[in-house]
Amino acid sequence: MDAVIAPRHEDCRDVERRAEPLPANAPLPMPVQSLLQSPRAAAVRSPAAWRRVLIMVATAVLSAAGIYEMYQVLQVGGITVLEGVVLVLFAALFAWVALSFVSALAGFTVLCCGWRDDVGISTDGSLPSVSSRIAMLLPTYNEDAPVVFARLQATRQSVDETGRGAQFDWFVLSDSTDPSVWIDEERCYAELAATHDRLYYRHRPHNTARKSGNIADWVERFGGAYDFMVILDADSVMTGDVLVRVAAAMETNSDVGLIQTLPVVVQARTLFARVQQFAGSIYGPMIAAGTAWWHGSESNYWGHNAIIRVSAFAGSAGLPTLAGRKPFGGEILSHDFVEAALMRRAGWRIHLAPTLRGSYEECPPSLLDFAARDRRWCQGNLQHGKLLTARGLHWVSRLHFLTGIGAYLTAPMWLAFLIAGILISLQAQFVRPEYFPKDFSLFPIWPAQDPVRAAWVFAGTMGLLILPKLLALFLVLIRSDTRRRFGGGLRTFGGVLLETMISALTAPVMMVFQSTAVIEILLGRDAGWQVQHRGDGAIPLREVVRRYALPTALGTTMAIGAWLVSWPLLLWMTPVIVGLLLAIPVALLTTRASRSRPLLMMTPEQIDPPAILAQVHALADRLCPANQTTDPLSALRGDRRLRELHLAALAFHPPRRRGRIDPHLATARVLIDDAESYSEAAGWLGPREIRAVLGDRETLQRLLQLSGEHAQLAVGSEPSG
């Protein structure tokens, strides 16, 4: 069993007794699901069938028109091998753009008509009553503990203000491997648990299956006591209003297994993060409304800020281990898509609620941090290729897998398309053409394209990319209240222009990063599990130059290649080349943090900040003492209550199995036995030995009882004794 801590209403000093009354064990079986056999499930009638026909027909017609025009561009004089490659790549990329455009157009239309969702969630009016038991689950991995707990506590206070707080229990499920983070989490927990009940903290000594395993462990141990669970990320904040409304919707719709809210990016401090924040705020609702409208009861799950029916999840979403070696085999990384697909396969409806406000998240502060997270997502999404043939999946669930895979494969396809285009031009410029083939022909073969039609194809493609932005802008401008929340019409229009320009500069760089990620995965390189970097995004100049050297070199090569052919080709490729050549200065500019109020790209949450976000800052400051020690051993040695809390939690660890030796713990025991003082022993222990000691009650007590100078006391601590 893992270390689990739970508060009682007694005095917070009674740590040993307080740790005993855990939430009553309510085991809930979560069997691993088979991908080879389809379970018997009740039929789900979706009103979205005709909507999907409309979307697919419109996408097919638009794609056919674009592909036909591109064929007409290339077929002048016959299609060569390189031109055939360009046509195939264009067909795939244009169909991708067409589907995105049609879906966004659907979102624009339904929002103009007042559509909200298919589960009847009211976004205003009085709050409904809730009678179900709801668990708020916050999985965390080596995050900034005071900020993580502050976000959770702000969410809790918002729920309590609705008068429905008694229905909610709160769990922090830690997979942290950093000893300092582990002890800091316990310190923050103790601070909040002293005055708040129904708050629980559990640390897993082994983070098996990462986040999905963390959630599954909770379901199997405590899930039977709860009707619903809300999954949060370490950067999630949700208002009580949105939580009560989605919980009531789950009660009303007994066949709904999951409702995904639309998280809005907040707290952006760098220019890069502000671009993502503004884009998500202004374009996100329209795009989400479009996908929710035609996905219907086969919508997707994004892994956080969603409410899930616990019994449905336990009975249908147990993840199998994929056959083969990493990166394609092993544990399923992008588990959210798969869990939603398995729940839908079992007959549960999956919905997206795109119009609910009050669901928030944060964004990586720089493109490098975004790309690091994207690398893990890329591997997880490509892994879904093994799941496309799973038995019994709904075709829309398979489409989710395909679009997730396509989100990353389109990057190397775009790069290949650009390179093939340059090669065609170089071939026409420098390679002597074979005007007369070896076989008999009355007419020569002229290598040529139609430049006028090519310009129209380019303009049409750009139109499909830009028009959704203009439609979203139109939705803001036509509503006076929405327009004011974005700072006015002129500032909103200027924000769209600035966002479009910066996105155009960073898109080619992201293309290179994603292409590199795909190649690495195909070569068998695993992404691992890195800590998500949050904060101000500051990156040393040397690191920026090193990481952006490849995009810059590629841009230089493309520019030289285009210049060797002709100035028109160079001008044609300017949007891509400029972004690559300016990769380093743009990176330095967009990672610079600013506390000042921006003139453009303002969002409603910046102009009129929700109270819950201000509470996060205040709570984080309260939970982070100025002279707090970062040494976990010193923290335990200098604070009796924290030490007793930690030791009480370790009482729930399973006993060591005979014959199984932890080499780091064994090394630590030898070093501790050989040391003449606490300071000497602590100085000899490395990070892995410290973590092993923190997880073993007997060894930790032996270390802390050694004589030696005490660690500096933390604020509010008591002398050891």
From Swiss-Prot:
Biological pathway: Glycan metabolism; osmoregulated periplasmic glucan (OPG) biosynthesis
InterPro entries attached to this UniProt entry: Glucans_biosynth_gluTrFase_H, Glyco_trans_2-like, Glycosyltr_2/OpgH_subfam, Nucleotide-diphossugar_trans
Keyword field contains Membrane: yes
Cell location: Cell inner membrane
Gene Ontology annotations of biological process type: glucan biosynthetic process
Membrane topology: Multi-pass membrane protein
Disulfide bond sites: none
Entry superkingdom: Bacteria
Enzyme Commission number(s): 2.4.1.-
Primary enzyme class: transferase
Keywords annotated in UniProt: Cell inner membrane, Cell membrane, Glycosyltransferase, Membrane, Transferase, Transmembrane, Transmembrane helix
Spans through the membrane: 53-75, 85-107, 404-426, 456-478, 490-512, 567-589
An annotated GO cellular component: plasma membrane
GO MF term (any one): hexosyltransferase activity
Function: Involved in the biosynthesis of osmoregulated periplasmic glucans (OPGs).
HAMAP family: MdoH_OpgH
PANTHER family found in the cross-reference section: CELLULOSE SYNTHASE CATALYTIC SUBUNIT A [UDP-FORMING] (PTHR43867), GLUCANS BIOSYNTHESIS GLUCOSYLTRANSFERASE H (PTHR43867:SF5)
Family designation: Belongs to the glycosyltransferase 2 family. OpgH subfamily.
NCBIfam families in the record: PRK05454.1-3, PRK05454.2-1, PRK05454.2-5
Full protein name: Glucans biosynthesis glucosyltransferase H
Species for this entry: Rhodopseudomonas palustris (strain ATCC BAA-98 / CGA009)
Gene: opgH
